[in-house]
Amino acid sequence: MNIVLIDSRQTTKDVWKISASRQVEHLKTHVNVQVGDTLRVGVKAGKRYLTEVVAVEEQLVMVRPLHEEVVPAKLSVTLIIAMPRPKVLRRLIMDSVTLGVEKIILLHSYRVDKSYWQSPFLQQLDQYVNLGLEQAGDTIAPQIEIYK
């Protein structure tokens, strides 16, 4: 995780709350975040900020924005692929988002197994996009189109 991606509803005051359990656990165990440390925080579909940690609690990390950072420009790349196997789809979406692809189109072809379209992985695309955005340090998700 190269940035912490939060929803705009978490940024209503001078102090922002990072409350997603996955993010809080990562910050505490892997980053070993302490009060006074700086973190890169991005607002979904918005801007990216350098922030200072003001409080670390059991299920919550609170940060204060210091200044705005430049969000990297998207590559003007459209990735068109036939629906892959579900586990490959997860990796493909995360890696494509990390690379900065602007648009992803998933197609059906005669070689695609119809069961792939009923996979629970399709319901979790937003989670994989968020993981890719956090890895890339980006805040703007690519457009994903699905044609069966």
Residue ranges of model-derived segments:
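RNA substrate-binding interface of SAM-dependent RNA methyltransferases
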Residues: V70-K148
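N-terminal positively charged helical leader segments and presequences
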Residues: M1-E69
